Amino acid sequence: MSENKNLSHNRKKDLLSKEVEHIDITKFDAREIISSMSKMSFVSRETANAADIYNEMLKDKDCTIFLTLAGSTSAAGCMHVYRDLVKYNMVDAIVATGASIIDMDFFEALGFKHYQGSQFQDDTELRENYIDRIYDTYIDEDQLQMCDRIIGEIADKLEPRSYTSREFIQEIGKYLKTNSKKKGSLIEMAYDNNVPIFCPAFTDSSAGFGLVMHQERNPKNHITIDAIREFRELTEI
């Protein structure tokens, strides 16, 4: 543990040297271990029960399946799992935090990375190196700001009116079709498969800075995010 705390000698390139790798569930069969958990206790048994319930939901053609995401799991390496759920028609809609969709998925679709770090790292040194920390995961603040600027540029090109987060994220998906550096992002996969993504707190992420910059450049003709209309769309699904 002391070694983890004593990282102040590392420079930025050293701190951002070990990428987070997203797990690929298509490369192994986890059914046996999940099934065996049904005879265990605590969270293990609940995980097996959840898998059984999910299987029943998939069999029920009248069941609408929402995938709900928290930002931390996305940064931790689960984005390909979520992408594959969309790819294989296992979800009907997604409700996520702005951090999951913009700071993690869109961020990586632009070619940027998340890096393995340490929760014991001196945050003062990280600040000096313009590195943001998500528990034990790092991202480059310069790259995050570039991501925000692109969000603003996408907004600049849209008709100035109100949009739900679903509509705006759909425009992001359209942008990625021709501009992504990393193919197969969740946003792009959802765009290709017509799976709506909702971010009820869209601006509760760095994407908010991008939209602020957009409104500063276009004080009289800018887009807005309509949370009330979005709520109605969600209830109609």
Write out the residue ranges for each language-model feature.
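Conserved catalytic alpha/beta core of Sir2/sirtuin-type deacylases, generalized to analogous enzyme cores
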Residues: 2-69, 74-237
